[in-house]
Amino acid sequence: WDQAMDVAGFRKLLSGSIDLSKSTIYMSQGKYVMSETGGLGVIIRKDIKAIKGGYSLLSEGTDLTNRRIDTYKTVISGDVNGNNQADSGDCGLLLVKGGIIGIEGVTFQYGYLSNNDAKSNECGSGIYINGNVNSTSVELTDCIIRDCKTEAVNGQGGVAGGTAIL
């Protein structure tokens, strides 16, 4: 927790060039909005060993014992406009274009993608996986996906695209 970052730092970590293939990202309870504006949200093109939610805000130092995913809800959200629904002005959550990623104990909520923001291979509002089938997958453990919506003609609201292991 000594290296905690804000939401903008988290988004940059996921989409940037830092190697996370051997790293675990620990997330405390709270809402992490994936963009400051509408659109696709965070685009990931790399391996991430693990993203684990459900930790208390009171966690300190290197203590990882204060974790209860049902009590300390960690939400990856697209609710840019803050009205607790997926609608115009909000963003998609994760667009995975490459990498093998493990995510545990996270709720994905209020992802939204308009028809104007969507492309033929970038049209999911929740978690959209679009990469090489041999090197791109997302494994979700103890996660919830809800209230995601897309108006894209070919889009999907929840998990869509490539390989997802639930």
Residue ranges and their predicted role:
Residues I127, C143, T163-I165:
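Hydrophobic strand positions within the blades of repeat-based beta-sheet folds
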Residues I25, A50-G53, L166:
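Well-ordered beta-strand segments characteristic of repetitive beta-sheet solenoids
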Residues G111, N115-N116, C148, A152, ...:
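Short, structured coil/turn linkers that connect adjacent secondary-structure elements
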Residues R11, I18, M34-A50, L58-E104, ...:
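Extracellular beta-strand-rich solenoid/capping regions of secreted or surface-exposed proteins
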Residues L20-T24:
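Loop/turn elements at helix/coil->beta-strand transitions in domains of secreted/extracellular proteins
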Residues W1-K12, K31, Y72:
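Right-handed parallel beta-helix/beta-solenoid
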